């Protein structure tokens, strides 16, 4: 799958083997985080296109157009405001 980062103007390949947050860090793209488990909401970003899901609904409140990088499962190519 492809992850397009709007503000970085770059696209990364992604295979769901790690969290999206971990994958971004491995590619030297850093974003704020704290808990890494869906509790705090610090890693929240806007999703513009595509679909994600969660194994368990995160405790952090998110809007329908937001995802948590630490715990989302990418279902399709996505475009995020990052």
From Swiss-Prot:
The keyword Ribosomal protein does not apply. Binds 1 [2Fe-2S] cluster. SUPFAM superfamilies: 2Fe-2S ferredoxin-like. [2Fe-2S] cluster binds at residues 35, 40, 43, 72. Residues 1-82 form the 2Fe-2S ferredoxin-type domain. Its cofactor is [2Fe-2S] cluster. Keywords: 2Fe-2S, Electron transport, Iron, Iron-sulfur, Metal-binding, Transport. Pfam families: Fer2 (PF00111). GO terms for molecular function: 2 iron, 2 sulfur cluster binding; metal ion binding. InterPro entries: 2Fe-2S_ferredoxin-like_sf, 2Fe-2S_ferredoxin-type, 2Fe2S_fd_BS, Beta-grasp_dom_sf. The keyword Iron-sulfur applies. This is Uncharacterized ferredoxin-like protein HI_1309. It comes from Haemophilus influenzae (strain ATCC 51907 / DSM 11121 / KW20 / Rd).
